[in-house]
Amino acid sequence: MIRAPLVKALGALGSPTHQMASRAVRTSAMVAQTPAKAPEKIEVFVDDIPVQVVPGTTVLQAAAQIGVEIPRFCYHERLAVAGNCRMCLVEVEKSPKPVAACAMPVMKGWRIKTNSDLTRKAREGVMEFLLMNHPLDCPICDQGGECDLQDQAMAFGSDRSRFTDINYTGKRAVEDKDIGPLVKTIMTRCIHCTRCVRFASEIAGVDDLGTTGRGNDMQIGTYVEKLFLTELSGNVIDLCPVGALTNKPYSFVARPWEIRKVSSIDVLDAVGSNIVVSTRTNEVLRILPRENEDVNEEWLADKSRFACDGLKRQRLVAPMVRMPNGELQAVEWEGALIAVAKAIKAAGGQIAGISGQLADLEAQVALKDLLNRLGSEVVATEQGFIAGGTDNRANYLLNSTIAGLEEADAVLLVGTNPRYEAPLVNTRLRKAYVHNELQIASIGPKIDLSYDHENLGADAALVKDVCSGAHAFSKVLEGAKKPAIIIGADLLERADGAAIHATVAEYCKKLKKPNWNPFNVLQTNAAQVGALDVGYKAGAQTAVKAQPKVLFLLNADAGKVTREQLPKDCFVVYIGSHGDNGASIADAVLPGAAYTEKQGIYVNTEGRPQQTLPGVSPPGMAREDWKILRALSEVVGKPLPYDNLDELRNRLEDVAPHLTRLGQLEPAGDAGAAGTISKSIGGGAIDIKLKELRDYFMTDAISRASPTMAKCISAVNKQQRENEAKQSVAI
């Protein structure tokens, strides 16, 4: 009876307050006040080409305006100017000696020569000094092929050196530092550009790296022997212009010209960082950041970068059905789909679905459509949210936007730790703290943020105090030009979550400014916003309360549903990529594709839809999630009305048109729960899941399968034990 549709289906599968005050004074002294009127531009000449620039523009920036590239090692657009590599020396007419282009502001009428004999000779001299102590490691260096020193030595260096064996005693050697399981160090290659030091201090907010010694004895290190453990440590690999700091898990794996690169997005948190997936022979080898000023700038969190080895482990590669003896046994797709179809037909419409944190939007729409055709409306997200609050998008979005948080001048964090829940949102807050005199306070447990903040306490009743104007920090928020309140998504799963949400939302209406919405919910789940946008109910308990006879788990691996909560005869179907919590309780396991193996839309915490692109094929018999659901619909006799991705995207456009406009933000209105919330905010302390660095590394099925993430947790635990031992000895 089902043979014909089955063939088609299988085909488809092809005191802090004082610290704040002192910091504000210090920052105000460093940051110049923005003038009310834009300054008049001045004219300078770069290689005899006139350029109009604003006062304060450096020589390097002026040259860049007309496409003239000046070599540099230490300079980076997002870091403070150091001016210590001297590779950017240029000639300025009437100047007695070359000037450092990265650090020298232009003056009116200057004539700058970037390719004169003096400039070329200066660059050759600097390069000769750099190579004097640099080892000839290029054949065995992981940076080979994408090394700034290689490129600039070819373009601007001399063809010979005066430091020969006759006249020179030999190159120096520097001991390598062990700074953790992520960054490999070969410090003999270091050219002392100090990019890593400035990144750690300015962006990551940890002063672990620095310089010791002088002249030829200068070294980059951690002062005392310790690990460089921060949620952003991998970015020093991208910043390092030579092979001194490289990717330790990627060591000796591949050369740049051997790999294929695919632009995609990260889904291991709700930021939606833009990434480049590097692959070879159908294997993901590494992940690098891709620049997007609105989302992640050019940074990438460590979990997003290094957890890619989890894509090769604990994978589901064949459909499985649980046998009478309780064991899962691998079967063909035909057998698995028939087993699920039989359970569906016996359920009589008592079916529910739960979407987890790695589910793409297309699969969520396909699951919802399938259950609707089978007579069920019970589709829910694994993560909870307030009842009645999903009708208004502004209720669950980061309305100030990720980039917009840089402009905030007062922020209240409620039940969230952005440093580990969304590291690249935290970098924006730190940026505002450094450059915008941002004042930050938190309600919840004491947390280690990368900037000074005032902890108001952990009692939930403090939310009411602040929002009623009775607290001292209320005056700070009300006096700010762009205030923001950020609520942790996990906090809203509390019994009084709706009351907290409503109280903050009402207060934010008072704080709202033109073109500025201060109400924010920081999601931690890449699939949450998209699911709520297409009509999913919030919380796994919504599905559990329905007591279904068939339950679909779509990448739901957080362990929020157990067999004990379900009817004894409930048939659980898991669709996902990894053997994790969801697969362990399933009666049928249908192997899906991971985010690097499919084209799928994810909506980040600010409501921006972006898509992943496939870099490799799914392993074994695994298929894209929506194709599995399409095939299953054929088998149960309720075929879904789309056979390819374009048709499915057309269906998505009917459901939520804004979700097909990739990369664009759809403005949301004011937050506020539907109806009146009568419950008051309960007492008790607010808690946070991700309090420490060790909590950050394993939060989903992919990172839990990653050996590198396991090494990170071991390293953090080891260092903490050593620190505790030192403290006990000191006492």
Swiss-Prot record:
* Quaternary state and interactors: Complex I is composed of about 45 different subunits.
Record-annotated residues binding [4Fe-4S] cluster 1?
H134, C138, C141, C147
Family membership: Belongs to the complex I 75 kDa subunit family.
**Species of the source:** Drosophila melanogaster (Fruit fly)
Q: In this record, what's one Pfam family?
A: Fer4_Nqo3
Q: What is its EC number?
A: 7.1.1.2
Q: What class of enzyme is it?
A: translocase
Ranges for domain 4Fe-4S Mo/W bis-MGD-type: 259-315
- What cofactor is this protein dependent on? [2Fe-2S] cluster; [4Fe-4S] cluster
Q: What is the protein named?
A: NADH-ubiquinone oxidoreductase 75 kDa subunit, mitochondrial
